[in-house]
Amino acid sequence: MLRATRVISAAERGNRPVADTLILNYAQRSAQVLTATGLKGGHFEIALAQATRLRTDDALLLEDGSLVEVVAAPEPLIEARAGDVAGNVAGNIASLARLAWHLGDRHIAVQMLPNRIRTRREPGVENLLKSLGAKLALIEAPFEPEGGAYESHAHDYDHDHAHGHHHHDH
């Protein structure tokens, strides 16, 4: 079983070939430690130094130098749209913002899309959104939620300048 310890962002990866592809759901893509089987049958141990959310087209660098591509798996989601009158753009934006506020207030992971919000399917969340007047569709799709203010952005990017402070004599 090959071990992966580093994430290569989609931008950093470019067109480098991959040895295999992992199709992972949101929970798996957020795990710090995981074992998974690729589409070509490879078995991989993912052991990241810190929890990092993997996104579609990111890759994992294996100990032998090869790459394994990451793809978000479809999973059960709720897609919520504003419930205001059609054609009332300002009202729809305000209603969508209200839905987002209520979900964020409960620290629920969301994926923001034009005119709609996606979140993982849970009965309590579904009931909340219905009570707020949202139009709901139960779908199966890849879930790529927003990062959030406290999410680590660790993709092994170098940061080569100091953040020293300077003082003024006054």
Show which residues each predicted segment covers:
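Short proline/glycine- and acidic-rich turn/helix-capping motifs at secondary-structure junctions
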Residues: 76, 114-120, 141-155
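Short glycine-/aliphatic-rich beta-strand segments at the starts of folded cytosolic domains
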Residues: 69-88
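Histidine-centered metal-binding segments
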Residues: 147-170
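Intrinsically disordered, low-complexity, positively charged segments
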Residues: 1-52
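Short, well-ordered loop/turn sites that connect or cap secondary structure elements
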Residues: 48, 54-55, 60-62
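Glycine- and charge-enriched low-complexity intrinsically disordered segments
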Residues: 1-18, 84-128, 132
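Short acidic/polar mixed-charge low-complexity motifs
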Residues: 40-44, 66, 76
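Conserved short beta-strand edge segments in small beta-sheet-based binding/regulatory domains
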Residues: 67, 135-144
